[in-house]
């Protein structure tokens, strides 16, 4: 029987220190590990994630949170890339949490919205994190709100959440952001 290696996480104190005050490379690596920890379903990881969030909370709450939603193909990724590049040009630090549909085989993201933001993704400073929706309704992933806190604690002053392509009734992102934009196709009704 083949065993799957267990994911070993650094201590929550190390992650917190790197997220809040580490070098740019250490910060990005710690953010990725922290969000992976948040998304994990293992009980011990859930405890670590709760502890980490407790340490990060004093460093959150100063970012503009922007939710972008719309039907598949409306141009959410294109809009976010243009907005992100503009904001970076204005001196802002931008994080993008892109929620993608989940693979029924692996459970991971299948569309890779990050690949559609080719100009933004090659910039040195923005942080772009694709996350699978894992069947969560409302266009966001189960731990999107917590992932936003990680981005805020890392000093990103604009956090953009791109929902999985949704209809008008799936607006969970509106309850976790300061501003919500619903992009629509021309001549599509409503």
Which residue stretches match the model-derived regions?
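Residue-level detector of intrinsically disordered terminal segments
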Residues: 6-8
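Hydrophobic positions on the alpha1 helix immediately C-terminal to the Walker A/P-loop
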Residues: 79
């Amino acid at each position: 029987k083949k065993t799957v290696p267990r994911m070993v996480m650094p201590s929550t104190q190390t992650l917190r220190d790197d997220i809040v005050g580490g070098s740019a490379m250490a910060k990005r690596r710690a953010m990725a590990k922290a969000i992976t920890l948040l998304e994990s379903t293992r009980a011990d990881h859930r405890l670590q994630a709760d502890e980490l969030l407790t340490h990060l909370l004093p460093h959150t709450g100063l970012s503009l949170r922007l939710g972008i939603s719309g039907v598949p193909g409306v141009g959410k990724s294109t809009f976010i890339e243009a907005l992100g590049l503009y904001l970076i040009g204005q001196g802002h630090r931008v994080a993008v949490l892109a929620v993608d549909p989940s693979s029924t085989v692996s459970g991971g993201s299948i569309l890779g919205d990050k690949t559609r933001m080719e100009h933004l993704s090659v910039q040195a400073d923005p942080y772009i994190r694709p996350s699978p929706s894992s069947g969560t309704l409302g266009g966001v992933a189960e731990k999107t709100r917590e992932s936003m806190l990680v981005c805020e604690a890392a000093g990103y002053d604009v956090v953009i959440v791109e929902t999985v392509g949704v209809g008008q009734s799936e607006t969970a992102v509106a309850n976790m952001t300061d501003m919500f934009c619903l992009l629509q196709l021309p001549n599509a009704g409503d």
